[in-house]
A protein has these predicted regions:
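Short amphipathic alpha-helical interface segments
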Residues: 10-23
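A short alpha-helical element within helix-turn-helix/winged-helix DNA-binding domains
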Residues: 27-38
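Alpha-helical residues within the helix-turn-helix
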Residues: 35, 52-53
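Conserved segment of winged-helix/HTH DNA-binding domains
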Residues: 73-98, 110-118
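C-terminal regulatory/oligomerization modules of transcriptional regulators
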Residues: 98-152
Length: 152
């Protein structure tokens, strides 16, 4: 899996909002998120708009405005953020794996792509914003992190 800058920025911005929710700091300006995370503000505004359209973030305009999480951090899976800014977790040439038609000679390839997507989902749907903000990953995910082979 290739994690794009857009996904990385979206998760990092959501983490800032999750921390702000813990502190009950109110709306956070896009400029502040961009400065803290070294994210270009114009690009960040587009990302935050996509997160808002997906119901992950809320926003308010004006001097007292900014962004905040629309849901508690423990209910926002990393997979939700990825889908909000990029669509399905895993595609092949932009198509969903179950829609591919390889024919009989390569049918197992389609099944492999479906298994890859399921594997990604098993991690990305299990890990929430609250998990990454607290640096406490779910046990099954932490086992993967602790396995030296995962780092190769």
């Amino acid at each position: 899996m290739r994690v794009t800058a857009k996904v990385d920025y979206a998760v990092r911005a959501a983490m800032v909002l999750a921390r702000a929710a813990e502190d009950d700091s109110g709306p956070i300006k896009g400029e502040r998120i961009g400065a803290e995370q070294h994210i270009p503000v114009k690009y960040l505004e587009n990302i935050l708009s996509e997160l808002r359209q997906s119901g992950i973030v809320r926003s308010q305009r004006g001097a007292e405005g900014g962004y905040w999480l629309a849901r508690p951090p423990e209910t926002v899976a990393i997979a939700d953020i990825i889908r909000a800014v990029e669509g399905p977790l895993a595609t092949v040439r932009g198509e969903r794996a179950e829609q591919l038609d390889y024919g009989e000679d390569a049918g197992a390839l389609q099944e492999m792509w479906i298994a890859v997507r399921a594997s990604l989902r098993s991690v990305l749907e299990r890990v929430t914003l609250a998990d990454v903000v607290s640096a406490r990953l779910p046990r099954q995910v932490q086992k993967l992190v602790d396995d030296p082979a995962s780092w190769e």
